[in-house]
Amino acid sequence: MSRPPLGRAEPPWPTIADVAARRAAGWRPTPLDSFVLKVHSRCDLACDYCYMYRSHDQSWRAQPRTMTPVTLARTAERIAEHLTTHGVTEAGVVLHGGEPLLIGDEALTRTVRTLRAAVGAGVRLHLSLQTNGLRLTEQRLDLLGELGVTVGVSTDGGRAAHDRHRRGADGRGSHARVEAALGRLASGRHRPLFGALLCTIDLRNDPVRTYEALLTHSPPAVDFLLPLGNWQTPPPGVDPSGRRTPYADWLWAVFERWYGARTKETSVRLLDNLLALLLGATPRTEALGLSPVRYAVVDTDGSLTQDDTLRTAYDGAARTGLDVHRHSFDALLLHPGIAARQWGTAALSATCLACPLHRVCGGGHYATRYDRATGFANPSVYCADLTELIGRVRRRVAADLGAHGAPLPSGAA
C-alpha cells in the first residue's frame, strides 16, 4: 500500500461532525465515568513501539514533567463537578504516564488523597495505576495497598519477546526486573492489588508461549493489544490486500488455548468482550463494539485530550484546546472528536455500515481507522483480521451452543 506522507492538517472526520445539529435532533452526551490522569510525562524505559514518545505527535516534549498540586486540585474538582452534575456514583481514575511511579511516594499519596477528598463518600472511586513495573518495590506496594490503588503492569511475555521492545535508554532489557516485580505483586499480601497484565502483540512471538508466559503470574486479566497503526502507516505484518490475516491467526491460537482450557485461567479481555458481543451483550471496550466512549485524558499541564493512541495518526490528533483550568468535562463531551465516538453507527463509515459484523467490531479501534484523505471515517486497518477472527470465534461458539440446542442470539452477527 502506497500512501502520501503524514501531514499536520486536521482530517475531514470528525472535525466536520456537526455536534450542534445532533443535539438539536435530540442527542445527549453520555456522562464520563473514567478519567486517565497523566501524572508524569516522562518514562524510565524507551520502548520502541511507544505511542507517547515514538509517534508523529511529540507534544510530550512541551509538557511539564509532573502535574502541579494546583493542576491536580483543579482536575479533582472538575471530576467531582462532572460526577455530581450527572449523578454518577461509581467512577474510575487511572494514574498514567509516562511512568506514573516516577512522581514519588509523597506526590502519589497527595494525588490519591486529593482525588478521594474531592469526590467524597457518595462516589465509589476505583483508583488504578498502569506501570512498567520497574519501581514496584515491596515498600511501594505497601503504600499502594494503603492507598487502595490496583496495579496493571505492561509486559510482553517471555524474556526474548519482552526485551525485544521494552528496553531502557541504554538498550538493556527490562524483563528480569519486571519479572521480579510481578513476583512481588502476584503473591502474598499484595495479590489483591493485581489488576491486569498488558501485552502488545508481536507476530514474531509464538502466541501460545506468550500467553502461557503471562499465565505464570496468575493474572486476573490479560489485555492483548494490537500494535497501533493506521491506513497511512500500517502496523507490522498487516496485509493491505486482506488476503492474509496474521493477527487473526495469532489471536485465534490464543483463543483455542484459552477457550479450550478445563477451567478459566484468566480473563482475556479482548476475547471475553468478543464473546459477549456475539452473545448479544454490550461490553464497554475501546477495541470492539459500539459502546459510547466514557473516558477522558488529562495531561500534566491540565489539558483535556482525546485518547493518547490518536497520537499515532498525526501531530495534534489528540488535542482539543480545552483544559481543566478553563473548561468542564461537559465542554469536552461536545468536542467533535469525543462526541462522534458516542454516536454509535452514526459515526461509522459507509463501508462499515454495509458489513454485517459492524455491531461486533464497531469499526475497530478508533485510532486504527485513520487515513489522511478521510480522517477516521474508515474501517480499521485491521478490518480483514477482525473479520476473520470474529468469523472463527462465531463458528466455534455457534457449534458449541448448537450441540446443546441453544443457537446464537438472533441479534448476533
Predicted regions and their residues:
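Short, non-ligating residues that shape and space the ligands of small metal-coordination modules
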Residues: 56-57, 361, 392
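Short Fe-S-cluster ligation motifs
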Residues: 74-96, 378-413
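Accessory C-terminal segments flanking Radical SAM cores
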Residues: 270-384, 388
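Cysteine-centered iron-sulfur cluster-binding motifs in ferredoxin-type domains/subunits
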Residues: 38-46, 99, 352-354, 358-359
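Radical SAM enzyme [4Fe-4S]-AdoMet core and its adjacent flexible, acidic
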Residues: 164-176, 183, 187-304, 309-321
